[in-house]
């Protein structure tokens, strides 16, 4: 299975309490869906966990992970990404994309000039933002992932066409 066959759906933010519960940050559109995708695995695939959500907590969800029973075990998992096989995820609608599919795409402006490549996708509550690592001689930039700024995403061609707002290009 290649990395593109798996999608990161969340991360462990740290221990919650003293009995092995964790604070889970879900990257799913509906945060609680993370528990419905079956066992989640680490990036390397060397560990997998069944997830049982316990309650909402500040910055995420409280959860129990199979085989994690102590605070120390939960603390050791801080920062670990949780992945699922792409086949277990729901189908996407038109103009919807998994963040993993956007990372690495070439970004060009509407005139064809290379701006760089998508390095990361962030969401701080107001919508997705593409972090573009600049092409040679160009600074990186942050682009709001809206139809106005990113009119074209062509996964098959591996490219994005962007129309950066005045002052960002």
Curated annotation (Swiss-Prot):
<keyword id="KW-0143">Chaperone</keyword>
<keyword id="KW-0698">rRNA processing</keyword>
<feature type="domain" description="PRC barrel">
    <location>
        <begin position="94"/>
        <end position="168"/>
    </location>
</feature>
<keyword id="KW-0690">Ribosome biogenesis</keyword>
<dbReference type="GO" id="GO:0005737">
    <property type="term" value="C:cytoplasm"/>
</dbReference>
<dbReference type="InterPro" id="IPR009000">
    <property type="entry name" value="Transl_B-barrel_sf"/>
</dbReference>
<dbReference type="Pfam" id="PF01782">
    <property type="entry name" value="RimM"/>
</dbReference>
<comment type="subunit">
    <text>Binds ribosomal protein uS19.</text>
</comment>
<comment type="similarity">
    <text>Belongs to the RimM family.</text>
</comment>
<dbReference type="GO" id="GO:0006364">
    <property type="term" value="P:rRNA processing"/>
</dbReference>
<dbReference type="InterPro" id="IPR056792">
    <property type="entry name" value="PRC_RimM"/>
</dbReference>
<dbReference type="InterPro" id="IPR011961">
    <property type="entry name" value="RimM"/>
</dbReference>
<comment type="function">
    <text>An accessory protein needed during the final step in the assembly of 30S ribosomal subunit, possibly for assembly of the head region. Essential for efficient processing of 16S rRNA. May be needed both before and after RbfA during the maturation of 16S rRNA. It has affinity for free ribosomal 30S subunits but not for 70S ribosomes.</text>
</comment>
<dbReference type="InterPro" id="IPR011033">
    <property type="entry name" value="PRC_barrel-like_sf"/>
</dbReference>
<dbReference type="GO" id="GO:0005840">
    <property type="term" value="C:ribosome"/>
</dbReference>
<dbReference type="InterPro" id="IPR036976">
    <property type="entry name" value="RimM_N_sf"/>
</dbReference>
<dbReference type="Pfam" id="PF24986">
    <property type="entry name" value="PRC_RimM"/>
</dbReference>
<dbReference type="InterPro" id="IPR002676">
    <property type="entry name" value="RimM_N"/>
</dbReference>
<keyword id="KW-0963">Cytoplasm</keyword>
<protein>
    <recommendedName>
        <fullName>Ribosome maturation factor RimM</fullName>
    </recommendedName>
</protein>
<dbReference type="GO" id="GO:0042274">
    <property type="term" value="P:ribosomal small subunit biogenesis"/>
</dbReference>
<dbReference type="GO" id="GO:0043022">
    <property type="term" value="F:ribosome binding"/>
</dbReference>
């Amino acid at each position: 299975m290649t990395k593109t066959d798996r999608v990161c759906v969340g991360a462990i933010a740290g221990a919650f309490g003293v009995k092995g519960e964790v604070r889970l940050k879900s990257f799913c559109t509906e945060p609680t869906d993370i528990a419905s995708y079956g066992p989640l695995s680490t990036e390397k695939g060397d560990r997998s966990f069944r997830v049982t959500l316990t309650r909402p907590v500040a910055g995420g969800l409280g959860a129990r992970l199979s085989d994690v029973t102590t605070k120390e075990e939960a603390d050791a998992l801080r920062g670990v990404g949780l992945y699922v096989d792409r086949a277990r995820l729901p189908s996407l609608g038109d103009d919807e994309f998994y963040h993993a599919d956007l990372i690495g795409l070439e970004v060009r402006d509407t005139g064809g000039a290379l701006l760089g490549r998508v390095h990361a996708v962030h969401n701080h509550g107001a919508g997705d933002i593409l972090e573009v690592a600049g092409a040679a001689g160009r600074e990186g930039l942050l682009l709001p992932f809206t139809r106005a700024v990113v009119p074209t995403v062509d996964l098959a061609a591996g490219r994005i066409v962007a129309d950066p707002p005045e002052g960002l290009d």
